[in-house]
Amino acid sequence: MTRQINTYLILALLLMGIGACDPNAEEDTSQNGTIRLQVWAHAGQQAEREVLQSQVTRFSQQSGDVDVKLTFIPERDYNAQVQAAAIAGDLPDVLEFDGPYLYNYIWQGHLLPLENLLPSTLVSDLLPSITTQGTYDQHLYSVGVFDSGLGLFARKSALDAIGARIPSNAAEAWSIAEFNQILSKLAEQDQDRMVLDLKLNYRGEWFSYGFSPILQSAGADLIDRRDYQNSQGVLNNPAAVAALQHLQDWITAGYVDPNLDDAAFVNGQVALSWVGHWAYADYKQAWPSDLLLLPLPDFGHGSKTGQGSWNWGISRTSHHPSVAAQFISFLLSVDEVLRMSNANGAVPGTRSAVQRSLHYGDDGELRLFADQLMQGVSMPRPKTPAYPAITAEFQKAFQQIRHGVDVSQVLDQAAQRIDQDIKDNQGYPAAR
């Protein structure tokens, strides 16, 4: 963590220098009474940026006396820049956070609780996964316009060819034994035997988001969630080792396509793709009448899946928290939620918007994703300031496991390093 901290400090000094030297730095309120609201967002897909920019314009027009200055920050650099701004005391009024990284900012004391700023009717309409993600130490600190979906996309024709059962919901998910048998049968009918895409071409947080549900489905986890003080005995227990041994076995058996061009499923090289909602549009275009969405396999304690995505919070240094809350409330109106969901394909963040959604409504092709979030199948990543250390260690462990290193040894080392980080930070005591 030392190298990260040094990087944040350097960026913070640069930000402080820029602020001190800028003679044109704007005040929060202009002479004509217009309130200037600073908003930071991640520079995601172009369609997302265009929708958010249009939302900012509509909000400013409706409010009349609020000028929203929207700044997009590259996604890869986002967390580092926000952390640097926090150290420099230069956070904007409103800003996004990537899912579980939220809790470290809360712990540092940078965010305001939202429960007294947002309408109660709006909060009660949020998906339970959204409020779970945004709640820390019994306070709501963030809300999301959308959430994510994680599952298995499949070609129905390939499954029919081997007589595979088609689960229609998480309760009917394939057992791990059944899934292993399906992989074997698919491989027998495939020339190169590669039948599963795990998006090994992805990087970073994908591996924690995409594969920690394997642990939870097996009865293990990344950390003991009772007090978030120990990974030992949880991340490296026998259930965790057995679960991730299955994953290593898939790779060793040659079932997993490395998918270097990110086109294995689209091109028909594999029958199954373990991925999130964002792949749907391309997959549907490639297989318009042959595409299925299925739950992840059950490793013994029920099918589990991931949750969490970008979410909005208000900085403690904001001079206009009520106006900031009005802006967030505007983004969470049904029409605006649907505009963003239609742009990025994600699960709408409110129940009202889900019901009006073409893809996620009762008869929508992606309804499984919404059901998983509303029915408790999805698992939030650990709600602890230690999460940056946890995910870094799990990502390292995943890479070692995929390359054949002993699973038990790898998980032992990861658990030890996570616990050492927690110890080094005095257990991450309650928010300052």
Language-model segments: which ranges?
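Long, aromatic- and glycine/proline-rich binding clefts that accommodate carbohydrate-like moieties
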Residues: 291-294, 342-400, 424-432
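Extracytoplasmic/periplasmic solute-binding protein
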Residues: 137-145, 150, 177-229, 270
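Periplasmic-binding protein-like
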Residues: 51, 156, 191, 329-351
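Glycine-centered hinge/linker elements that transmit conformational signals in sensory
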Residues: 180-187, 220-258, 284, 296
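Conserved N-terminal structural module of periplasmic/extracytoplasmic solute-binding proteins
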Residues: 3-8, 13-104, 122-123, 260, ...
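Pocket-flanking alpha-helical
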Residues: 76-113, 123-142, 152-153, 158, ...
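A bilobed periplasmic-binding-protein/Venus flytrap-type ligand-binding module shared by bacterial periplasmic
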Residues: 153-156, 307-320
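Hinge/lid segment of periplasmic solute-binding proteins
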Residues: 97-151, 207-210, 214, 292-297, ...
